Design a protein with these regions (language model features):
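Catalytic and substrate-binding regions of extracellular carbohydrate-active enzymes
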Residues: 1-173, 182, 268-270, 276-283, ...
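Short, surface-exposed beta-strand/loop "edge" segments at domain boundaries and coil↔beta transitions
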Residues: 2-6, 108-117, 143-147, 210-220, ...
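Ser/Thr- (and often Asn-) enriched beta-sheet segments in non-cytosolic proteins
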Residues: 101, 160, 201-209, 217-223, ...
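Extended, compositionally biased non-globular segments
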Residues: 131, 244-264
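Polysaccharide-binding surfaces and accessory modules of carbohydrate-active proteins
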Residues: 151-227
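N-terminal compositionally biased, intrinsically disordered segments and leader/signal-like regions
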Residues: 199, 208, 235, 241, ...
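Extended amphipathic secondary-structure runs
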Residues: 204-237, 259-282, 406-407
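Non-catalytic terminal regions with compositionally biased, polar/charged low complexity
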Residues: 261-272, 278-399, 406
Length: 407
């Protein structure tokens, strides 16, 4: 792992001691720091009111809170998530990282009786570039969903939020996100809140001023798909206590509130999931992503499908498929996927990446991957030569490989 260029995700449940009420919570690493952190335990550790009301509760974590009420016992907690699928399996020390990794998790949120899944992935696009994929689906078991709130916290001093095309969202001060809405008191720990009601795709940029270090400011770039009946917020949250004791941080963590982005989906968030791309970058190592757009599966019956197109500045184009049911098939512009997750890239500079996650079929221009049983298959072209990793036998009668392939 390269300390500056590698990417890493931490996904947290609530099974065992010293646990928080956080659902499926994640942390993101980038450019040498935990950029998207867990909040920690507060100024007065486990005995403090701030721990009981905020630091141990959903809104302090990078997760989704349902109807403003998601919670359950903390410290000793028995609310784990289920691992539905992942790639790769736990590796032996020293093994190289694959260019695509992912996990698909399920969680039952007990307070609201909601079903939640979170599919997260790392896609490496070059020796020093890559991005995170996040698809979070959430809905109440018996309907009647009021709203689902997606929280993301990031280090830094400034946060900008615009439409994905750069246009102004006209954010306005708001008193939403508060205990007064019959929500958790943790909401009232947020302040300097601004909101825009919009169905547009949005782009958030979190900036860490590195003037006291090397002057190479660090950014976390966040793209999120827009949906009807959605609001987006910027806010400030209490400081990130969990990193305040870490040496060599870029600024005094205890003196800086935590930059917070919130997306509120009114109604259910299963057929209108939170679909995001995250990419760390710096002033000297700018974003490698040219654009992020989204697509729907062709045909009917896949209302909860998520499709993402990520265009990189090096000419690579990734089409990302996320399905809630691996038994279903999604098609788009000649591509076909029957899986939880898939990444299909174009061919650029003699390179190409095709990934099938917990699936049985992937069809892309010039290539077909098929297995009898659900499998993870990574097929890559590197400098003109093909390589494959598979968790199960692949039917080569349906897999077109050039004669210069290596299997």
């Amino acid at each position: 792992m390269h300390p500056r260029n590698s990417l890493m995700i931490s996904l947290n449940g609530s099974e065992g001691n010293h646990m928080h009420a956080n659902g499926i919570s994640m942390e993101l690493y980038g450019k040498g720091y935990v950029l998207g952190p867990d909040a920690g335990i507060g100024l007065f550790l486990y005995s403090g009111l701030d721990y009981a009301e905020y630091y141990s509760q959903f809104p302090s974590h990078n997760t989704v809170c349902v109807d403003g009420i998601s919670s359950y016992p903390v410290m000793k907690s028995n609310h784990s998530f289920d691992l539905l699928s992942c790639f790769p399996a736990s590796a032996e020390p020293g093994k190289a990282f694959t260019s695509v990794t992912y996990s698909n998790l399920y969680f039952r949120e007990p307070e609201s009786r909601a079903d939640q899944t979170r599919m997260m992935s790392i896609v490496t696009t070059g020796a020093e570039t890559g991005y995170y994929v996040d698809v979070f689906r959430s809905r109440k078991e018996k309907g009647g969903d009021k709203m689902h709130d997606y929280f993301y916290h990031n280090l830094g001093q400034t946060l900008t939020l615009t439409a994905a095309d750069g246009s102004d969202l006209n954010l306005q001060p708001t008193e939403e996100l508060a205990f007064a809405g019959a929500h958790l008191y943790a909401y009232s720990y947020l302040y300097d809140k601004k909101v825009a009601a919009t169905n547009k795709d949005v782009k958030a940029t979190f900036t860490i001023d590195m003037k006291d270090k090397d002057g190479d400011d660090i950014y976390m770039n966040l793209w999120m798909k827009g949906e009807p009946d959605r609001e987006v917020f910027t806010a400030l949250a209490p400081m990130t206590e969990g990193l305040s004791r870490t040496p060599n941080m870029p600024y005094n963590i205890k003196e800086q509130p935590t930059l917070t982005f919130v997306a509120r989906q009114h109604g259910e968030a299963w057929n209108r999931p939170f679909v995001s791309i995250y990419e760390p970058s710096t002033k000297k190592e700018p974003s490698a992503i040219q654009s992020v757009s989204y697509f729907d599966a062709e045909g009917a019956g896949l209302e909860d499908f998520a499709g993402i197109c990520v265009k990189s500045k090096n000419g690579r184009i990734d089409h990302i498929f996320s399905l809630s049911d691996a038994a279903q098939t999604a098609t788009y512009q000649g591509m076909k996927v029957k899986a939880d997750y898939a990444v299909i890239s174009n061919e650029y500079a003699g390179n190409r990446t095709l990934f099938l996650g917990n699936g049985t079929q992937l069809v892309a221009p010039g290539v077909m991957i098929q297995t009898d049983n659900a499998a993870n298959v990574l097929l890559e072209k590197k400098e003109g030569k093909w390589y494959i990793i598979s968790s199960a036998p692949v039917s080569y009668t349906h897999l077109t490989l050039p004669t210069n392939s290596r299997v």
